[in-house]
Design a protein with these regions (language model features):
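Cytochrome P450 heme-binding Cys-pocket and its upstream "meander" loop
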Residues: 63-71, 110, 270-279, 384-419
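Cytochrome P450 proximal C-terminal region
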Residues: 2-21, 41, 73, 162, ...
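Cytochrome P450 I-helix active-site segment
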Residues: 39-45, 49, 155-159, 206-217, ...
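N-terminal membrane-proximal hinge/A-helix region immediately C-terminal to the signal-anchor transmembrane segment
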Residues: 2-136, 157-164, 235, 364
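Cytochrome P450
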Residues: 2-21, 83-90, 149-160, 169-191, ...
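Conserved cytochrome P450 catalytic core segment spanning the I/J/K helices
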Residues: 146-150, 171, 186, 217-218, ...
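Cytochrome P450 catalytic-core helices
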Residues: 185, 291-316, 414-432
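Hydrophobic mid-domain F-helix/FG-region of cytochrome P450s
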Residues: 20-24, 86-99, 123, 140, ...
Length: 433
């Protein structure tokens, strides 16, 4: 009897597999027939179902565009069609088109991350929602970041955590810098968002869950128990539960007077539901945790290979320290004097490529120059191509912070990260070689 059940279960599995394969193949043929030769960019659609996804995601050094993009751009040009993440796609390595895509969010394009990512990010994440809900959640995040970056309380937290972390290194022969800096960024986020101190057990629990979360974020998105993806989905659920418990505790205590963290501000406004509040807190924690930590690790790597840059950076921070009293804390005016530090951060962002590309989808037919981008197609603006374009950057493979002579406009989240990194670097370069 057991063998018979196993036989039928295998037959059903194969049947569902064939039906799924057929559906995706017919969908692909339908979309292509709906857009026959409408000035589509040249390109290759690759294999059925997976298309060219595996080749596109093949690991490569962060200071290059990788063999896939190099080969396709040399054959098809800077803009080409492909089949990626189970969808027909337009890949753009053209700086002008990339800017056009980013400047026309919600008008011509919307976020379109693969469905399995929703299981990790959550259905209300800023990366997965669109339209009015996206605007609503984004406005909350932007208001928090804009109000936080220059407040004495936030600046004091950044400096205090920087100093305490480096103090903890003194009795150790070696450290794992990437782990240490992730601990620094998550402790800073939970302190400023939720008033949780680094030494509290819950802070360590949140760090562990975020580490598990990130392993699944870049893994094969198949939910099989024990895989990185399945563990990440569970970690996200635990993080949501942790934040939800804190929210309900605050509400039960009638929002403790004087706490003044981000969660208190949201709860007092009463503009978000509980699930929206949980999601926006986790989104800000994710952005402040992974991208900031990765960028800071890259900066240390680049400085180790550029002694002249390190020396110039050290001189800038020595001058700032000499202008202050002993143990006088850094302030917003000090940050504004860190001009070369800002250039180092911008150059590390260019050379390190923390964010290689983003997922977008055309919500209507879009004509750009001689190309047509059909409605419903995935659009992937690739930023690394512009970062290493010799027409935009002289000697693009060289780490040269002095190339940044113009103040670039960055998103509010990037500005917050720059403050954290600048204060951390201040104490790092003055205390370590």
């Amino acid at each position: 009897m057991g063998e018979l059940l196993l036989f039928f279960s295998n037959i059903l599995f194969l049947l569902f597999l064939v039906l799924g394969f057929t559906f995706l193949l017919l969908r692909r043929l339908f979309i292509i027939k709906q857009n026959p030769n409408k000035n589509l960019p040249h390109g290759s659609m690759g294999w059925p179902i997976c298309g060219e996804t595996l080749a596109f995601l093949k690991p490569h050094k962060s200071n290059s565009t990788g063999s896939f993009l190099q080969q396709h751009c040399s054959i098809y040009g800077q803009v080409f069609k492909s089949h990626l993440f189970c969808s027909p796609a337009i890949v753009s390595c053209d700086h002008e088109l990339n800017m056009f895509i980013l400047q026309n969010e919600e008008k011509y394009f919307q976020a379109s991350y693969p469905k399995p990512m929703h299981g990790i990010l959550g259905k209300l994440s800023l990366l997965t929602v669109s339209g009015d809900l996206h605007k609503k959640l984004r406005n909350v995040a932007v208001s928090f970041i804009g109000a936080s970056k220059s407040t004495p309380a936030f600046l004091h937290s950044v400096e205090k955590l920087s100093i305490s972390m480096m103090e903890s290194w003194k009795e150790r022969k070696q450290i794992t810098f990437c782990y240490e800096i992730r601990k620094f960024t998550i402790n800073l986020m939970v302190k400023h968002l939720l008033s949780i101190e680094p030494e509290e057990p819950i802070a360590f629990k949140i760090l562990e869950d975020f580490q598990t979360f990130m392993k699944g974020f870049v893994s094969l998105p198949v939910y099989i128990p024990g895989t990185h993806y399945a563990n990440a989905v569970k970690a996200r659920a635990r993080l949501s539960r942790t934040v939800r418990e804190i929210i309900r505790e605050r509400q039960h205590e009638n929002m403790r007077a004087g706490e003044g963290d981000f969660l208190d501000v949201i709860l007092k406004k009463r503009s978000l539901s509980e699930e929206e509040t949980v999601s926006i807190v986790l989104d800000i924690m994710l952005g402040g945790y992974e991208t900031t930590a990765t960028l800071l690790a890259l900066i240390v790597y680049f400085l180790a290979h550029a002694p002249a840059v390190f020396q110039k950076l050290k001189e800038e921070h020595r001058a700032i320290r000499k202008s202050k009293q002993d143990e006088e804390p850094l302030n917003w005016e000090d940050y504004q004097q860190m001009e070369f530090t800002n250039n180092v951060i911008l150059e590390a962002m260019r050379c390190g490529n923390v964010v290689k590309f983003v997922h977008r989808e055309a919500i209507r037919d879009v004509k750009f120059k001689e190309y047509l981008i059909p409605s419903g197609w995935k659009v992937l603006p690739v930023f690394t191509a512009a970062h290493f374009d010799p027409n935009l950057h002289e000697n693009p493979s060289e780490f040269n912070p002095s190339r940044w002579t113009v103040c670039n406009q960055l998103c509010p989240g990037a500005e917050l990260a720059k403050v954290e990194i600048s204060f951390f670097l201040h104490h790092l370069v003055l205390n370590y070689r």
